[in-house]
Structures are given as C-alpha cells and as structure tokens.
Regions:
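Active-site acidic/histidine clusters and adjacent loop/turn architecture
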Residues: 145-234
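Mid-length scaffold segments of soluble, non-membrane domains
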Residues: 208-215, 223-232, 240-244, 249-266
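Surface-exposed patches in mature extracellular/periplasmic domains of secreted proteins
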Residues: 90, 161-170, 228-237, 271, ...
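Ser/Thr-rich, Pro/Gly/Ala-heavy low-complexity intrinsically disordered linkers and tails
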Residues: 1-38
Length: 352
C-alpha cells in the first residue's frame, strides 16, 4: 500500500531553548578528604577559607589542586592539635620565600597526601640540609624524590621518622671500606610505646639508622608493650667501623644494628643486661633473669632481628644485647655449646 499520509506541518515549536548558562561548570578539583580543614594544607577557594593569622589560599589557577591554605614562614610553621590535622613544614616557595605546607601522613591518607598532590622530599627553607617529606602539587614536582617503600611503610605505621642525609664514610684506617646506609632516617621516640634513651643521656633523643632497623624496632615495641616496657636504654646504633681483624663491615657501620643495655617497665622495674643476666638456656634463679632470657628468645623466634648476641656469646657483650639485620642470618646461640669466657683484655676479643 501507500505510505501514511503526511500529517502536514511539523509540530509547533514548544518555545525557545533554555538560555545558555555561559561557561561550563567550574572544575571543583579533586575530592577534598577533609584533612586540615581551615588550616595549612587544607583545601580552599579563597583566603577566607584560611581563617588563621597570615593565612592565604594558593588556588587551583596557580597549580594547587583544590587550593591549599598556607602561611609565610622563616624557619618553623605552627601545628594544630587534632586527628584531622597533619604536621607542617617550612619549605622554599615559588617566590623564593618560606612557605608552610603539610607533611605527608600515611596514617591519615592512603597516598600520604590529598588527591592531586605527591609526597616528595624537600629541604627546610633556612636549612636545606634538613629534609622532610611534604605534600606538593603532582604537576609541579618531578618524580623520583618521594619516599621509598621502607620509609613509606614506616610512616604508615605511625613511626616518628624524618629522612636523614646519606652517609659516605670510611672506617678509620680503612679507605678500602665504605659505610653506606639504606634509606637513612632519624627515628624519634616513642617506638611505638617505649622511649629510647642513650645510656649516658638524661632524656630520649632521635636515633640515626637505616630504615629497615626502624621497622624492626616497631615490631619489637609491640612485644615490649606486652611487659609494660616504657623505656629502652641503648648503647648506640651507627658506628662506621669494620669488625675486629676482618675485612667485613660491622652492621653498626650500616646503621642496621643496635645495642640494648637495659629495659625499664612502667612500674620502675629495671631489667639490666649487665646486672640481671643469667643464661641464654636452662633454668634461671630470678624473675629478671627469666625475663631477659625470654626477650632474647622472643626476638629470635619472631625473627625481629637476624642476629642476637647476649653475654653468653663472649665477654665483650657482658653488658648488652647486640641485635642486627645481617641478611640471610638467624642466630641466637645454641644450647650445649661452650661459650667463650673472659680470659684477657677486651681488646683481645672479636667484636660484632
């Protein structure tokens, strides 16, 4: 048959089209995770969103995704208390002046920074040799200067760590040997619940070490917490030297070893290696001796450290546990093996 008859004219126009709103909707930028609200490192659309002394907004147009609040600084930046706030740091801004930014925080943000920002290492404005990990716009920073996997894990665990300068030292009289440190950092107390104090110091101080040692101390801290240990008295970490009568570097030369002299519980009980140690194997006569024996075995059994040397090892260790991360090792000391005893001067004995 024939096609349907033409109905005539097209349907009447229902009216004029909606007015053009002009430009497309403004880009709201990355989603704001709600970190640092109204504070340094927080999102902002203008200076009014940064309601603190000297607060200004670095906007999206200037390359800061979602905007970020900042403040001029000469050396230090203020910090805000609360779970929503990160620690700040003073870096050199684009104008060559000091500018407060947020430090990376992997405990609050999966990538350590807000979306659109990267965690990178930068020097302090007045002291460029003092570095820290801060959040800067991804588009404005180059790759390769962020935290390595170990340092990122340390930050994610909540350890108080800051990057440290690389070392390139030689043991005295041994220019053929070089001390290098893997991902050097400073670790501050508590770790995670115990303060670390050098034996001659009146108060805890940050320790220079390789990053893997910081992770090991975190694991040890969880074990020490079971006994209520709040302070660890140590006898040193980094020392660029070779082992005695050897061409091998000590693990102290790699900052992957630490010597423990004593452990102090919250009730004031002191477990001193020098005064309370009895033996690595067999029955002990005192509670303190039993605890020291148990913690030595726990560090070994849990593989917190690869080597644990106690006073049973030799006379050099009469007053401390030496623990380190020697690759491929798993040593504590075996029962039934006669251990060397002190028969001369300490200088005659091998050292760890």
């Amino acid at each position: 048959g024939s096609p349907p008859a033409d109905s005539g004219s097209p349907p009447a126009d229902s009216g004029t089209p909606p007015a053009d709103s002009g430009s497309p909707p403004a880009d709201a930028g990355p989603e704001d995770p709600g970190i640092n609200p109204g504070w340094i490192g927080g999102a902002c659309a203008g200076d009014g969103d940064c309601p603190f002394a000297g607060g200004t907004c670095l906007g999206t147009a200037a390359g800061w995704p979602g905007g970020t609040c900042t403040q001029a600084c000469d050396r230090y930046c203020p910090d805000q208390e609360g779970d929503l706030f990160t620690v700040t740091f003073c870096v050199e801004g684009e104008a060559g002046t000091g500018q407060c930014v947020s430090r990376c925080d992997f405990t609050k943000l999966e990538e350590g920074c807000r979306p659109g920002y990267s965690c990178v290492r930068r020097g302090s404005y007045q002291e460029p040799e003092v570095t820290n990990l801060v959040c800067l716009p991804t588009a404005l920073v180059g790759p390769g200067d962020g935290p390595g996997p170990c340092l990122e894990e340390a930050l994610r665990l909540g350890l108080s760590v800051t990057p440290a300068p690389s070392v390139f030292d030689h043991p005295e009289g041994r220019p053929d040997l070089t001390c290098t440190v893997e991902e050097p950092l400073y670790l501050a107390s508590p770790v995670p619940g115990a303060n670390y104090r050098y034996m001659d110091a009146a108060s805890p101080a940050r320790m220079f070490m390789a990053c893997p040692l910081a992770l090991a101390l975190h694991d040890l801290g969880e074990v020490l917490a079971e006994s209520g240990i709040l302070e660890v008295i140590h006898m040193g970490v980094y020392n660029c030297r070779a082992m005695r009568d050897s061409d091998n570097l000590s693990q102290h030369a790699l900052a992957q070893a630490i010597d423990f002299g004593a452990f102090v519980a919250g009730d004031g009980t002191v477990y001193s290696v020098e005064h309370d140690w009895e033996s690595l194997h067999g029955e002990t006569e005192t509670e303190k001796g039993a605890w020291l024996q148990a913690i030595a075995h726990r560090m070994y059994d849990d593989r917190i450290f690869n080597i644990i040397l106690t006073p049973d090892y030799n006379a050099i260790h009469y007053n401390h546990f030496h623990v380190d991360l020697t690759p491929g090792s798993h040593y504590l000391g075996k029962p039934g093996v006669e251990v060397p005893r002190f028969l001369g001067t300490f200088a005659e004995w091998g050292d760890d």
